Amino acid sequence: DTDSDLVLDVDGNPLEVGSEYYIGRAVGFYVVERFSSDVQIDSGLCRSDGFWRVSLDAYSPPTTTSSQQQRYLTVFRDRLSGLKLVGLTDDSDRVVL
């Protein structure tokens, strides 16, 4: 459903605007806005790729000035364990959520 703010993360858990999202044992990030989403349904699995903005503070999202870079959630494969992990990137071409 492209009108929904619901998407599943790499573990199959719902990621929603207004929810808190953790990266390992790090401080939680709050999903504050979805910029765009491309929903694909393949073999019964729903995948949504798009741009999301996250904040350390749910009530006052960060503003981006010309001296600051936008940060995005991305998925990468850990070299030691081979597991897919979630991380932050400032490269908009590497956004995978």
UniProtKB/Swiss-Prot annotation:
Alphabetized InterPro entries for the sequence: Prot_inh_Kunz-lg
Designated name of the protein: Kunitz-type trypsin inhibitor 1
Species: Selenicereus costaricensis
Family indicated by similarity: Belongs to the protease inhibitor I3 (leguminous Kunitz-type inhibitor) family.
Sorted UniProt keywords: Protease inhibitor, Serine protease inhibitor
Function: Exhibits Kunitz trypsin protease inhibitor activity.
One Gene Ontology MF term: serine-type endopeptidase inhibitor activity
